Regions:
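Cleavable N-terminal export/targeting peptides
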Residues: 1-34
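Transmembrane beta-barrel domains of Gram-negative outer membranes and organellar outer membranes
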Residues: 22-281
Length: 281
């Protein structure tokens, strides 16, 4: 697994160098080329902020630290350190590659604590335009989750996760929607398959402040949840940290948080408090 991750990272960086060396100054350092390429891609896209839960159709370069606190109806708290978040890098004009390290899961119950599954994904920008060209973005994402979890803290087998995401911005508001699936590579009878449909409305109310409300729906086919559906409403807030000396060449830090609130009769947990620290570069 470690060797595979190192190979993937090496290939991505080689692709990035090949894609950017022809357009950016050879006198720039790798970090300067990295940030300059990100600015070039951002100029082709609308101004969104990545949803707390749902997929982002834009190509972005980022690193995220995320912690989730899930609470069941009996009051049991499960803490997920990592929460399926990691880092991403833009390669060329149309691709983003992401790596999600295994999260650490603390159950606060009789279940064994341990590490969950690692994952990778590739995002392809189908079409996009900034506010001068239509203010929209459409992307296809293909993820692969590796069954690396310990003590049953992950899936029984690997799985693929295709997702279609799109967004449209209008003045200080935008709407983002995505539809995706989790398709295990084996043991379908026990694991089942699922479809996730996320819809997000965002408002950029102040230069440093965004608010959003998400609807997170999951539909299950096969497995222990066969035929069931769960839904969460997720309000969230984002604060962009930029000092007076901030420049476009500097990284941007974002502090954000929100709460998933169960609104369906069936749900695997009642509430999920999510907090994050993001760095965009």
């Amino acid at each position: 697994m470690k060797r595979l991750v190192l190979i993937c990272i090496s290939v991505i960086f080689l692709m990035f160098n090949a894609a950017t060396n022809g357009r950016l100054s050879a006198q720039q350092t790798f970090i300067e080329r990295l940030t300059a390429h990100n600015r070039m891609m951002s100029a082709k896209q609308p101004v969104f902020i990545s949803p707390l839960v749902g997929a982002d159709p834009r190509l972005i370069q980022y690193a995220k630290l995320s912690v989730a606190h899930q609470y069941t109806s009996t009051g049991t708290e499960t803490v997920n350190y990592g929460n399926g978040r990691g880092a991403g890098i833009i390669v060329g004009d149309r691709f983003e590659f992401d790596f999600v390290p295994p999260p650490y899961i603390q159950h606060n119950s009789a279940a064994d604590d341990g590490f969950g599954d690692a994952a990778v994904s590739a995002k392809f920008r189908v079409a996009s335009a900034n506010k001068e060209g239509g203010n929209y973005d459409v992307a296809f994402i293909l993820g692969h989750c590796f069954a690396t979890g310990s003590h049953k803290n992950g899936a029984s087998t690997d799985s693929f996760g295709p997702t279609l995401a799109a967004g449209y911005a209008f003045h200080r508001f935008d709407v983002i929607s995505s539809v995706g699936a989790i398709l295990p590579t084996g043991k379908i009878g026990t694991q089942g398959r699922s479809i996730a449909w996320n819809t997000v409305s965002q408002a950029h109310i102040r230069p440093h402040i965004w608010f959003e409300i998400e609807n997170n729906a999951s539909f299950f086919a096969g497995g222990t949840h066969d035929g069931k559906m769960q839904n969460f409403m997720t309000p969230a807030a984002f604060y962009i940290v930029r000092g007076k000396s901030w420049k476009a060449t500097h990284p941007t830090f974002i502090v954000d948080g929100g709460m998933q609130i169960a609104t369906s009769g069936f749900h695997t947990y009642n509430h999920n408090l999510i907090t994050e620290l993001r760095m965009l570069f």
